[in-house]
Amino acid sequence: MTEVPPIPVLHLEGGWQVAVEDWKRCSGRLRLRDGGVDAGVHVERCAAGRLRDAYPVGARDVEVQVTDAVADEALTALLRELAEAVQRADPECRRVVYAAPEGDADQVAAAECAGFRRVVDVDLADRQLSLLVVEPDWVTRTDIDLDHVPET
């Protein structure tokens, strides 16, 4: 079993005020404020959290959960900033994951506007979720030369 690295400390840009409510090795709770937005956020290594058995998680994958109701435009801005903050704090993170309730078209659309891509619907013990991810270019980049074997 691969050891799960600690969750990185996130530094948000763009005027967000951040208050740490709780921080542990693999998860943390933040209170974020910007203008009229006041939102609770939970960040967690997927391999140590509720999604650990939901898909083939990477040790460095991070789930971001917005725990308070936020308007769609504000949710988009918040998710975009959280994804960027995770990628700045942990350049080896392969996936930033946002789990929307399955069938919630508004949350899925807000996440997609923030740069997330819908990848799979999963069933947890108590709910069904649509997983959306942001992945860095080094994960999604492909070599279109099919005759070339990488690193040869």
Language-model segments: residues:
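Actinobacteria-biased recognition of intrinsically disordered, low-complexity terminal regions
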Residues: 1-38, 46-49, 56, 140-152
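Conserved acetyl-CoA binding element of GNAT-fold acetyltransferases
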Residues: 52-70, 130-132
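Conserved acetyl-CoA-binding loop-helix of GNAT-fold acetyltransferases
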Residues: 72-87, 113
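Conserved GNAT acetyl-CoA-binding A-motif
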Residues: 86-100
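Conserved beta-strand-loop-alpha-helix junction that forms the acyl-donor binding cleft
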Residues: 96-107, 124-126
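Conserved active-site tyrosine of GNAT-family acetyltransferases
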Residues: 110-111, 116
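Conserved catalytic-core motifs of GNAT/GCN5-like acyltransferases
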Residues: 117-131
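Short, cationic-aromatic polyanion-contact patches
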Residues: 132-138
